[in-house]
Amino acid sequence: MNSVIELLQTLIRIPSVNPDGDPGVSPEGEYAMAAFIGEFLEPLGFKITQEEPLPGRPNLIARAPGPENRQRILLGPHLDTVSIAGMSIEPFSAEIKDGKIWGRGSSDTKGPMAAMLWGLKENAANLANLPIAVDFVGFMGEESSQPGSQHFAQHHADEYEFAIAGEPTSLEAVYCTKGCLWATIEAQGRSTHASQPHLGDNAIMKLTEELNRLVNDFGGQLTKHSHQVLGTSTINIGKIKGGNRANIVPDKASAEIDIRTVPSFVENQSGID
């Protein structure tokens, strides 16, 4: 492998779509990514280990060569990508066209990952002598509920001074981000034939009423909390499920919501009704 471009193309050609909520996707993509990265970094002197927050889906941990008693920083991109559904190009071709590399994950985050890995390769002879150890971790599951980074933080957070995540940010340094909460709201009703809806209890209608209240009342409280860089806290209703047929009053309905919070919201959450 002769260049960072070739490295990025190789990474893109390893399909690693997050399998959560994407039926039919192979759950082995993150493992394949971890195996490749381990083979890339081990000859450079890195100590390679894997930890599995979920079965068969590892975090790849590479500790830099040199003294263990140094302060440590972390390069931490993620192994998985979002779905390829709806793409109009071959998702894993890594074709170079119009001065760009095309493919799923080319920017999020296999592009930054390739830059990090190539930087470690080019500086391999000096890594053991640096005053600070530069470790690399490839996180699994970032595009869903982030079990990889959560597991790593629980077991290793106190080992590091800071981390560079490598998300695509138009080459601007980003030092803060919104917090994230995913929640599911469920409504229970009573099923009956649609010709006599008064005999049932429509779960979708109950859910809709609750979602309206949530957006209007709780959403209004969220927007009171702002940050000079991040803007306001937000809420989004991202997915709704309910019912089986149009002529049946639904007895179950659910919605998945995404809440993004700024620091002042977390600091003052005791004041939220």
List PLM regions with ranges.
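Acidic/histidine-rich catalytic neighborhood of metal-dependent amide-processing enzymes
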Residues: 109-182
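Predominant activation on well-ordered alpha-helical scaffold segments within soluble catalytic domains
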Residues: 9, 38, 114-117, 121, ...
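Acidic/His- and Gly-rich active-site-bordering loop/insert found
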Residues: 1-101, 106, 125-130
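Glycine/serine-rich anion-binding loops at beta->alpha junctions
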Residues: 99-115, 193
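Metal-dependent amide/peptide-bond hydrolase catalytic core
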Residues: 43, 49-54, 175, 182-273
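Acidic-glycine-rich active-site phosphate/pyrophosphate-binding loop
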Residues: 83-97, 160, 175-186
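Short coil/turn motifs at secondary-structure junctions
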Residues: 80-82, 141-143, 190, 262-264
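Short glycine-aspartate micro-motif
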Residues: 72-74, 101, 161-165, 184
